[in-house]
């Protein structure tokens, strides 16, 4: 009964997210998206066999992502995995309609099997305050160890706190104490390529052929058509959407691959790996006992040395 209830809640959450996504596009087209939604729809796992997180397939620019994870944690305990997505304050980028919009951010944390998002009833007051306004989702119903966040307003969410619950090997023999790896990705801004392979307007547009620019047509929506005349007299047309700025003019000679526009992108994606040790309480107790033993041994050696010195002094040695 509990499992059925959880499934219903997950499906309801996914449905609500989808509605929010669609309504955002329809009613707020100027917003710039850093949606993990696309990866969830197109990839079974967000991490390829090569180790690359799939967000990098659409977000081609690289920018740093920083993660802070405890060196070790106890079993069945809640800890914080902090993802930092740095960029300059008040940075703007080109939206889908060509207007300037604030950057948004998104992040994905791939936890080891058995680790998962901590239930809210176990969040501390500090965690509740740090995660206010942040909505966490699982990558899929089958993968509750992969947590996705975003899109969020970037200027107020450059640091995202993920509350994580560790497994308890004493109650579940599938998990073991030891060192585990986490895979983390953070993104700011729009991608350069859509999952379909089509370019967004947040990328450099280049010429597909060599020749002379015959003419440039400005379309009503603000986009352009660049007509290039090849050496054989054939005319090819390059479509440039609204947003990027042209850096060429009529009668310019260009080669295939030369840029026609500036690079409007100011965002980027970054990923990294981190490690955490699931610490056995018995190991901690053993370590404490070891240190106590070492301390007692040193004390006994000092006492023995003093005793020997007293005997030697009494015997006149």
UniProtKB/Swiss-Prot annotation:
Signal peptide: 1-34
Transport keyword on record: yes
Entry keyword set: Electron transport, Heme, Iron, Membrane, Metal-binding, Photosynthesis, Signal, Thylakoid, Transmembrane, Transmembrane helix, Transport
Source organism superkingdom: Bacteria
Chain ranges passing through the membrane: 284-304
InterPro entries: Cyt-f_TM, Cyt_f, Cyt_f_lg_dom, Cyt_f_lg_dom_sf, Rudment_hybrid_motif
One Gene Ontology term of the molecular function aspect: heme binding
Coiled-coil intervals, chain numbering: none
Annotated compartments: Cellular thylakoid membrane
Cofactor annotation comment: Binds 1 heme group covalently.
Residues annotated for heme binding in this entry: 35, 55, 58-59
Topology of this chain in the membrane: Single-pass membrane protein
Biological process according to GO: photosynthesis
Family assignment from sequence similarity: Belongs to the cytochrome f family.
Subunit structure: The 4 large subunits of the cytochrome b6-f complex are cytochrome b6, subunit IV (17 kDa polypeptide, PetD), cytochrome f and the Rieske protein, while the 4 small subunits are PetG, PetL, PetM and PetN. The complex functions as a dimer.
Function: Component of the cytochrome b6-f complex, which mediates electron transfer between photosystem II (PSII) and photosystem I (PSI), cyclic electron flow around PSI, and state transitions.
Name of this chain's protein: Cytochrome f
Lineage start: Bacteria, Bacillati, Cyanobacteriota, Cyanophyceae, Synechococcales
Gene that this polypeptide is encoded by: petA
